[in-house]
């Protein structure tokens, strides 16, 4: 009975969209790809961020994440995912003209890492905002260790057209204003994402193995594949498993996705609530900043989640402030592994499937999550990342066991309705084909990227590092053989130069003491009231 009621709402919304197909051409997509710079023997590059790539502080397309050696490439948000991937490929091709003898590491799990203290923390110059970004990263090192921060991923940003929400609200007799209805709809999408994201880990998880040194001798439940490689035989994404690391400070922080206000409120409390072990350390050691504050979270982005509600921020504005004042604008999917077989880590069929999947999450009925269902969602996710390919694996739905294969097949069939609409809107059958590709992985687990990684390593008798370096070299060769057209190369050169000039300007115009700047930044969050 429940399924038919839920399908009724989905069917009504599908009919409405079917009459407004043009709206589906206005969804926006953006991709962020992180990757380590490595030496030609597969070790972490300890060179500074190449100046030829511009300023990591002000270049909007090429920056660094945690480490000076961890690059992040950011595409613009565009309506056509094919153009987004073209942009991501262009960035890779440009970067390879500036890397010298270094490589971009192909998988999510890191290369052989140096001693913890030798992993360089990203530098952003002498402006107050640049220093703040550096101190925040020092705080992450203090709290979670540097090693964990070297894991890379793909972030997929997605928004539905703003004109869609009033249509849905009016058809359903809703009374919220445009902004609040839109925010509620995105939070509902996130609840459904929590319910169904285990499917993404099965289909796209690509990290069943890792370098033994990554665990630094910590206790673990992994098995030895060879002397230098740890793995789990049925794992899809060790990157998204706990790997024996727990954040005790964040353990009690489970933002409620029942509405935007409860979500922002829980994060606001966390960035304003001291955590005794951090208080004990303090913010300074030997006169140097070691963390921005001693609270559960230094800033909102420290909260680790698989998906985030987002709003583009104004200069100097904090993410929570933007969400509270203007509502949710898009979602950022953060649980995707980099596929080491793909030059940019993701391809068009994956993007097309993600679009249909996220559209399904947005339009399917999304009841509130109680504590029991919340725990069930987390358990299903963790089960799939550790043993998603185990034959006969069962998950839990409504408290009852259900075979992963049966549930995945049912979900893909339902997502197929959205793929059909997207194909009608865009012409062709690319979305339906993307779904067929994913269903084939459900039917045959050997087709999943995680199984392919293990098969390739076994076939070549390679360690994790050897396999990853071979893939990195293959991709490097492909990029270097395809230089950008001169005008595109020039455009990226200009972007890099302008970003360096912008950083220099910021540093020259800087007024005010850094301690006061941090104090004001901290106070900005405490001053917000609902």
Curated annotation (Swiss-Prot):
Keywords: ATP-binding, Glutathione biosynthesis, Ligase, Nucleotide-binding
Any Gene Ontology CC annotation: cytosol
Regions crossing the membrane: none
EC identifiers of the protein: 6.3.2.2
InterPro entries attached to this UniProt entry: Gln_synth/guanido_kin_cat_dom, Glu_cys_ligase, Glut_cys_ligase
UniProt GO BP: glutathione biosynthetic process
Catalytic reactions on record: L-cysteine + L-glutamate + ATP = gamma-L-glutamyl-L-cysteine + ADP + phosphate + H(+)
Database matches in HAMAP family: Glu_cys_ligase
Protein family (similarity comment): Belongs to the glutamate--cysteine ligase type 1 family. Type 1 subfamily.
PANTHER family reported in the protein's UniProt record: GLUTAMATE--CYSTEINE LIGASE (PTHR38761:SF1)
Name the record gives this protein: Glutamate--cysteine ligase
């Amino acid at each position: 009975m429940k399924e038919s009621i839920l399908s009724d709402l989905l069917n009504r919304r599908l009919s409405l969209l079917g009459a407004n197909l043009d709206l589906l051409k206005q969804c926006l997509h953006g991709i962020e790809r992180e990757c380590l710079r490595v030496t030609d023997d597969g070790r972490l590059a300890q060179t500074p961020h190449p100046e030829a790539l511009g300023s990591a502080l002000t270049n909007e397309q090429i920056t660094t994440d945690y480490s000076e050696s961890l690059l992040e490439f950011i595409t613009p948000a565009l309506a056509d995912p094919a153009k987004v991937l073209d942009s991501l490929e262009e960035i890779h091709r440009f970067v390879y003209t500036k890397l010298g003898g270094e490589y971009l590491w192909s998988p999510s799990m890191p290369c052989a890492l140096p001693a913890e203290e030798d992993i360089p923390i990203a530098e952003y110059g002498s402006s107050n905002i640049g220093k703040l970004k550096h101190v925040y990263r020092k705080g992450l090192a203090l709290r979670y260790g540097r090693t964990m921060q070297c894991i890379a991923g793909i972030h997929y940003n997605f928004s539905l057209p703003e004109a869609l929400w009033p249509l849905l609200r009016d058809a359903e007799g809703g009374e919220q204003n445009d902004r609040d209805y839109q925010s509620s709809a995105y939070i509902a999408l996130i609840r459904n994402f929590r319910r169904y994201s285990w499917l993404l880990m099965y289909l796209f998880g690509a990290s069943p193995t890792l370098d033994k040194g990554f665990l630094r001798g910590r206790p673990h439940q992994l098995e030895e594949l060879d002397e230098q490689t740890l793995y789990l035989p049925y794992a899809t994404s060790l990157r998204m498993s706990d790997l024996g690391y727990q954040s005790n400070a964040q353990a009690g922080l489970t933002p409620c996705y029942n509405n935007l206000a409860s979500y922002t409120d829980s994060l606001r409390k966390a960035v304003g609530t001291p955590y005794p072990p951090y208080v004990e350390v303090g913010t300074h050691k030997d006169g140097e900043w070691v963390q921005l504050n001693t609270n559960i979270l230094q800033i909102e982005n420290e909260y680790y989640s698989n998906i985030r509600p987002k709003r583009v921020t104004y200069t100097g504005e904090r993410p929570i402030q933007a969400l509270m004042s203007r509502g949710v604008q898009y979602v950022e999917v953060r649980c995707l592994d980099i596929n080491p077989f793909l030059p940019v880590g993701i391809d068009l069929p994956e993007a097309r499937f993600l679009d249909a999947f996220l559209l399904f999450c947005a339009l399917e009925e999304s009841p509130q999550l109680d504590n029991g269902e919340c725990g069930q969602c987390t358990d299903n996710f963790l089960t799939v990342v550790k043993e998603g390919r185990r034959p006969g694996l069962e998950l839990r739905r409504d408290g009852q066991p259900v075979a992963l294969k049966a549930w995945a097949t049912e979900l893909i069939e339902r997502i197929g309705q959205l793929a059909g609409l997207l194909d009608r809107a865009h012409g062709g059958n690319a979305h339906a084909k993307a779904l067929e590709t994913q269903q084939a992985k459900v039917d045959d687990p050997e087709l999943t990227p995680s199984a392919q990684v293990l098969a390739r390593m076994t076939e070549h008798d390679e360690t994790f590092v050897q396999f990853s370096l071979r893939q990195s070299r293959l991709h490097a060769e492909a990029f270097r053989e395809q230089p950008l057209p001169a005008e595109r190369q020039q455009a990226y050169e200009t972007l890099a130069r302008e970003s360096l000039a912008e950083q220099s300007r910021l540093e020259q115009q800087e007024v005010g003491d850094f301690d006061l700047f941090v104090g004001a930044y901290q106070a900005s969050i405490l001053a917000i009231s609902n």
